[in-house]
Amino acid sequence: MASSHWNETTTSVYQYLGFQVQKIYPFHDNWNTACFVILLLFIFTVVSLVVLAFLYEVLDCCCCVKNKTVKDLKSEPNPLRSMMDNIRKRETEVV
């Protein structure tokens, strides 16, 4: 008799706890989804700007430079340009 009472008690406790548990659904609320999308767009914008700034410095295409000739631009010191010139000047060994 005591074991059946204990089983009934545990069953009722489980049922009571089952009603108290709330399932959590990510992005169930539209505001959460909107904030997440805005955050992703912000991160994408920042990363894109960093990549563009890096490429602008590395490539140094001089598209915006005025009143300079190609000869003037080539004569300016540029570590990347000198490295590329050194690579081009190396003799390749044909095997």
Swiss-Prot record:
It comes from Homo sapiens (Human). It is found in: Membrane. The chain crosses the membrane at residues 35-55. One of its GO terms (cellular component) is membrane. Pfam families: SMIM5_18_22 (PF15831). Coiled coil: none annotated. Its main location: membrane. It is a single-pass membrane protein. Keywords: Membrane, Transmembrane, Transmembrane helix. This is Small integral membrane protein 18.
